Regions:
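C-terminal regulatory/interaction module of P-loop NTP-utilizing enzymes
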Residues: 1-223
Length: 223
């Protein structure tokens, strides 16, 4: 597999310089073709993946809804910078086939009924709050939950529910953006709905958005 990192990717609008690649983010079963600056067709293998780091300040560009629809937004946790004196464990090469077997999108084999019930309750909440998911995003979330729930271990909540919580946090909540008291009221109602579904990680994100928005002239947004 090949992993390409776009560091500080939103210093310029990503749709300007990455538009040819964004077209390939649509789900497909075969390798795609892009035409770059040399005008020659370039075949893109299935094994190529992009990761991007972004910053949020006055020097960066916002991410478009079109881009967010095709990406999973992962917020890195704050960690203590403690020097690790133990030697790093050497990990050998991992084949694409093995990666797909463990981490590729999967249908939910267990708790399918519970996940379906969660979906039926969540979708009206999202739509009522103005978050409209494309069929692509719904497929990606379902595939993620199927893969993650087979890897996660049950803890304070079932593995499938924790996986669904991560999916909502990464695919739905980045779309939150709005201003004013009326939007805040809807956001509080949305938070209560997430809490009733047991999506505690997503609730924490909404709480953070509410706190920051209250201190930023009622401007509530994920980024």
């Amino acid at each position: 597999p090949f992993l390409m990192l776009l560091d500080e990717a939103n210093l310029s609008p990503m749709e300007y310089y990455w538009s040819d690649w964004m077209r390939l983010c649509d789900e497909q079963t075969s390798s795609g073709i892009v035409t770059l600056w040399d005008k020659a067709p370039t075949k893109v293998p299935e094994t190529l993946r992009f990761m991007a780091t972004i910053n949020n300040d006055s020097t960066t560009e916002t991410l478009s809804p079109r881009l967010i629809d095709r990406a999973a937004v992962v917020t890195l946790p704050v960690v203590d910078c403690i020097e690790n004196t133990s030697p790093a464990k050497v990990v050998g090469p991992v084949s694409w086939k093995e990666l797909q077997a463990y981490f590729g999108a999967k249908a939910v084999s267990k708790n399918a009924r519970e996940l379906s019930d969660l979906h039926d309750r969540l979708m009206p909440m999202l739509e009522g709050f103005g978050i409209m998911l494309s069929p692509r995003s719904i497929r990606q979330m379902n595939g993620y939950v199927g893969a993650a729930s087979s890897i996660f271990a049950d803890g304070d909540k079932p593995a499938w529910l924790d996986a669904a919580d991560f999916a909502v946090m990464q695919k739905c909540l980045p779309r939150i953006t709005g201003t004013g008291a009326a939007y805040r009221e809807k956001l509080v109602e949305f938070r209560s709905g997430l809490e009733s579904l047991g999506l505690s990680r997503s609730v924490e994100v909404v709480d953070r958005i509410l706190r920051q928005g209250d201190e930023a002239m009622d401007c509530y947004r994920f980024f």
